[in-house]
């Protein structure tokens, strides 16, 4: 998990996205029929369940079900294993999706930098395979 932090400090920081900032590329870039992620739990449901701000993510509806199950079957804490599993699995999928988005952003930044470098070389007249006239003489 810390590899992106090491690459930021030891590698080229211009092609490493900041994990605390929003992505710079649109989410449907390269995926025209990609659907936008939507929250299942509404703001009112999360307020009614008194969820902390850190827990209000795309898996909040599973957490609300888990907390309700724990409340309803209080002494029997093992009764909510399926709800706990559903919430953990949703958190895992969310984490994997965020890591894929981070990697996608990193690759798009690298591609953008390569294209800018290639355009700058072509503007100077020194593209790949071309020889500078001074060197040719």
From Swiss-Prot:
Which Pfam family, any one of them, does this sequence belong to?
NDUF_B7
What this protein is reported to do is described as:
Accessory subunit of the mitochondrial membrane respiratory chain NADH dehydrogenase (Complex I), that is believed not to be involved in catalysis. Complex I functions in the transfer of electrons from NADH to the respiratory chain. The immediate electron acceptor for the enzyme is believed to be ubiquinone.
Point out residues bearing the modification Phosphoserine. 73
Under the GO molecular function aspect, what terms does this record hold?
A: NADH dehydrogenase (ubiquinone) activity
What UniProt notes about the protein's domains is: Contains two C-X9-C motifs that are predicted to form a helix-coil-helix structure, permitting the formation of intramolecular disulfide bonds.
Q: Which residues form a coiled coil?
A: none
Taxonomic source organism: Pongo pygmaeus (Bornean orangutan)
Q: What is this protein called?
A: NADH dehydrogenase [ubiquinone] 1 beta subcomplex subunit 7
Give the UniProt family note. Answer: Belongs to the complex I NDUFB7 subunit family.
Its localization reads: Mitochondrion inner membrane; Mitochondrion intermembrane space
Spans annotated as Disordered: 113-137
Q: Which UniProt keywords apply?
A: Disulfide bond, Electron transport, Lipoprotein, Membrane, Mitochondrion, Mitochondrion inner membrane, Myristate, Phosphoprotein, Respiratory chain, Transport
Chief site of localization: mitochondrion
Membrane association type: Peripheral membrane protein
- Here the disulfide bonds are 59-90, 69-80
Chain ranges of the CHCH domain: 56-98
What Gene Ontology cellular component terms go with this record?
A: mitochondrial inner membrane; mitochondrial intermembrane space; respiratory chain complex I
Q: How does it assemble?
A: Complex I is composed of 45 different subunits.
């Amino acid at each position: 998990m810390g590899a992106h932090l090491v690459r930021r400090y030891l590698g080229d920081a211009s092609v490493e996205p900041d994990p605390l900032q929003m992505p710079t590329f649109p989410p449907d870039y390269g995926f025209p029929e990609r659907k936008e992620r939507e929250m299942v739990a509404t703001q009112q449901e999360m307020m009614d369940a008194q969820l902390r701000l850190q827990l209000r993510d795309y898996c909040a509806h599973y957490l609300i079900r888990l907390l309700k199950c724990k409340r309803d079957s209080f002494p029997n804490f093992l009764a909510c294993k399926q709800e706990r599993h559903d919430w953990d699995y949703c958190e895992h999928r969310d984490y994997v999706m965020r890591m894929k988005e981070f990697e996608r952003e990193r690759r798009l930044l690298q591609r953008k930098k390569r294209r800018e470098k290639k355009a700058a070389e072509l503007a100077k007249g020194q593209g790949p395979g071309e020889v500078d006239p001074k060197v040719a003489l």
